[in-house]
Each structure stands twice: as structure tokens, then as C-alpha cells.
Amino acid sequence: MKAYLSNPAKASLLLVILIGTVTLVHAGSVYHSTDAINKTAVTNKATASRAAAEAKRAEMRMVVATATSIYADMDLEDSGLSRQAFQNAWIGYYKLKKKGLLKKTNVLTICDFSQSSSNQRMYVIDVRNRRVLYRTYVAHGINSGEEYANSFSNKMESCKSSLGFYITSRTYSGVNGYSLRIDGVDKGFNDNARKRAIVIHGANYVSMRVVHKYGTMGTTFGCPAIPTEMTTQIIPVVKNGSCFFIYYPSKKYLAQSSVLNS
């Protein structure tokens, strides 16, 4: 060491070696420090993701519990409305409301197509006061089935009903009289509703009289038609931004609905 210190050139070389060693040690420390930070960030992100997923599951458990309570309190089973129809309707209604997509949140309409068309299978529910405002007949598309609807489509000219969630829009007077436009918001299942001219309208072939005479309810080109005399009662209540749901226990729909699974 003394030899190095007495020789300026060797002293400089020693200094360079020492600085390089310190630099390498420091660089290694920085590397290990950065690696630790990255691992911590990944861990924190995973923890946050799990927490968010659990919070969402807890939220859905609460929504389902609320639906179960309302279903029981309103004795909806006695009215023929299936538990699954109401539960899914409530979940979708909740999600659409949470996203701010519903202008009118005090009304929820459910068409339970798991029932026979000769049943009064359309329910207009007062959400706030938890009571059924109207229960009436509703027709399905001619190519969806006869007494029971069991085939559904979003395709043009299919003449089939489309499953899923809709948001009601404006009224108009057309060939079927006082009618209501609806917008399908379930991607791939009913989002062609406007193009297909799917609306709520009255029809004289939707009545018990028709069932008694012909043995089955009349059908449509895909519209959820109701008795003509009910249009002036129901349409003003549900128009302009309320949730309208057409249900059937389709495994594909329930698994892929963009509303239910959002």
C-alpha cells in the first residue's frame, strides 16, 4: 500500500479500483432495492385486486338478499313470477341504476317468458312502494314458439323475441296506435331492437278472448305486445327511461349478458 501511495500513477490506479468497487456495490444495492419495490408493487396490486373482487361479491350478495326479501314480501311467487326472473331483473335494474342509465328508477317491468302466453306474465312493479301496479298479458314473437316462447334472436327479420334488458324511451302513435319505443342494452342479445322496430304496443289478439277462441295467444313480429286497453294505463307509467326486462332461463343469456355480468 505504501508503494502505491508513494507512486502517483499507482495511487491513481488504486483510487480508480476503489471507486469502481464502490460503484458496483452501490449499483447492486440499487438493483436489489428496485427489485424489492417492484415485487412490493405487484403484491399490493394483487391484494387490491382481490379486495375489489371480494367487495364486488359482497355487493352482489347484498343485492341478491334484497331481491329475495322483496320477492317474499310482495308474495310474487303466488302471482306466478319465477324467483329467478325477479332476482335477475333486480340485479340488472340495480346495475343500470348504479351506472346512471335509468331516468325513471321507481318502476321495474318484467316479462316472464318462462310462463305460458295464456298467463298474465308481464309485471309492472312499483319499486319504491314494493307493489305490483299492473299484471297483464304480453305476446312473444311468432318464431319464438306457440304457447311458450323458447327460441330468441337479435337478428333482423327473425320475427323472434329478444331476451334481456331494455330502457324505455318515447311514445309515438303508429299503425298499432299508442306505442312505446324501447332500446336494448344487452349487447348481442337485444341491441338491434331499434333497427328491428321492436316496441311496446297494443294488440287486439292479446287477450283471454283470443285464447278461448283459438286455444293460444296471438303472436307478433318480435314486439312485446299487450292488450290494447292496457296501453293507456301502462305506457305512461313506464315510458321515458325505466327498466324493462324480458326473461327466459337461457343458460347462454344468463352466462353472457353484458348487463348481468358487468
Q: Over which residues does each language-model region extend?
A:
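Bacterial Sec-dependent N-terminal signal peptides
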Residues: M1-I37
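Short aromatic/basic micro-patch
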Residues: A225
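Cell wall/extracellular polymer interaction/catalysis modules
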Residues: D35-T220, T228-P236, S242, K251-Y253, ...
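Active-site proximal loops enriched in glycine and acidic residues that flank catalytic Cys/His/Asp
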Residues: Y248
